[in-house]
Design a protein with these regions (language model features):
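Short, active-site-adjacent cap segments at secondary-structure transitions
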Residues: 15-17, 53-58, 102-103, 131-132, ...
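Ligand-binding beta-strand-loop-alpha-helix segment within the catalytic cores
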Residues: 61-123, 138
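Loop/turn-to-beta-strand initiation segments
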Residues: 43-47, 120-123
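Short, charge-patterned binding micro-sites
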Residues: 50-66
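Short beta-strand segments
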Residues: 8-12, 50-51, 96, 125-127, ...
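N-terminal glycine-/serine-/threonine-rich phosphate-binding loop
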Residues: 1-46
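Polyanion-binding loop/helix "lid" in catalytic or ligand-binding cores
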Residues: 28, 32-35, 128-131, 172-187
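Internal active-site segments that recognize and position negatively charged phosphoryl groups
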Residues: 89, 111-163
């Protein structure tokens, strides 16, 4: 197996809330910070993408335009990154977004992210891709490709891939394996 030099960690917003299903579980976030510290101490760059599901599930709300719902979701990821980066006090951190957020974050650029990694910082990527209709799962893949990450690590509040949302559909089918062609055919 290739030696890892850079990884991007994806935390679902729901995973941050633990059993509460909203807000934050501080003990859990502290544990995540200690796990990330072990990775950083091995000389591996760590980027973090966090979802917004502990605050906003826009796709489940028919009372708002999808674009606006996704924009609210992007802002939820910014809130989660600000909170979590503060909890990661054992590191120097920075938060990058694909859109301006005043003084709370910095605007994403590949060069800026690489400079932060060179300084040993844990870099948080908030706001997804900055465009509606794309999940933070898309954002993590985009950032991983842009930044030549060796791996994407997922920490989500779900145990696999399903044909529909198992929280909404109790009869959702879990896939043990899922060939890419099957995904393409189902689209």
């Amino acid at each position: 197996m290739k030696e890892l030099k850079r990884v991007i960690l994806k935390l679902s917003g729901e995973a941050l809330s633990g059993e509460a299903k909203s807000g934050y579980d501080d003990a859990l976030i502290e544990d995540i910070a200690h796990q990330v510290k072990k990775i950083v101490e091995k000389g591996i760059d760590v980027g973090v993408v966090i979802g917004g599901g502990n605050y906003w599930r826009g796709r489940s709300n028919d009372n708002i335009d999808r674009t606006k719902a996704d924009q609210i979701g992007m802002l939820a990821t910014v809130m989660n990154c600000i909170y979590t980066a503060d909890a990661f006090r054992v590191f120097k951190t920075n938060i990058l977004t694909p859109f301006e957020c005043g003084s709370m974050t910095k605007l994403f650029s590949k060069d800026r992210a690489n400079k932060y990694f060179e300084k040993g910082m844990v870099v948080f990527f908030a706001g997804g891709t900055g465009h509606p209709y794309f999940s933070t799962d898309t954002g993590i893949v985009l950032r991983a490709i842009e930044l030549d990450a060796d791996a994407i690590l997922l920490a989500k509040a779900i145990d696999g891939v399903y044909d529909s949302d198992p929280k909404i559909n109790p009869a959702a089918k879990k896939y043990d394996t899922l060939p890419i062609q099957e995904v393409v055919d189902k689209k």
